[in-house]
Amino acid sequence: MTVDEFVKMDNSFNEGMFLTKVNNIFVKLLTAIMMDDLDSVRHFISDDVYKWAESIAKEARDNGHRQMYDELNVKESKIDSILEEPRQYVIKVYLQSRYLNYIINLSDGSMVSGNDHSRIQVNYNLIFTKRKATEKQGIARKCPGCGAPISVNTSGKCEYCDSIYNQEDYDWVITSLEKA
């Protein structure tokens, strides 16, 4: 279906705001891999994407390395398609990113592999899903554990009671990320 057709089904959907969210989640995800801090993005990603990201971070960590994605930015993102499934909506997004891609040794900071002088362009196909019976995003800004206000853009964990905020119950979650 087209974006206009989807807006008729979900009048709260805004293409520009959605793509801004996609770009931010993508940058946060690669930054979380680089910093070996996947908890900071756990609430934005599915279990499969978490496992993919964790495998990259774990391999680097186990070897005493760090995967670097320096000077990371999104050059372009666009909605390829929108599908309605029985229990969820699916939006496929094409994303063009640029970054320095290299690996460093954590003990001395030396470069192990890659290029820290020239950015590469990498294209991705991303899939975002949202449950049809989701609650409104405004309601989701309260911790499910204690009711305290939470900032879902910075962390998926309540700073008061440590409850984990599950974004898929309320909003779009990245469920697939593949190089195009």
Where are these regions (language model features)?
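Short metal-coordination and nucleic-acid-contact micro-motifs, chiefly zinc-binding Cys/His arrays
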Residues: K136-I139, T154
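Short Cys/His-rich micro-motifs in 6-15 aa windows
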Residues: D162-D171
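Surface-exposed, charged secondary-structure patches
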Residues: N63-D108
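Intrinsically disordered, low-complexity segments
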Residues: R98-T134, Y170-A180
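Short cysteine-rich clusters marking metal-coordination/redox-active sites
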Residues: C143-C146, C158-C161
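Core segments of small alpha/beta cavity-forming domains
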Residues: M1-E71, E159-Y160
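Short hinge/gating elements
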Residues: V3-F13, D108-N115, G147
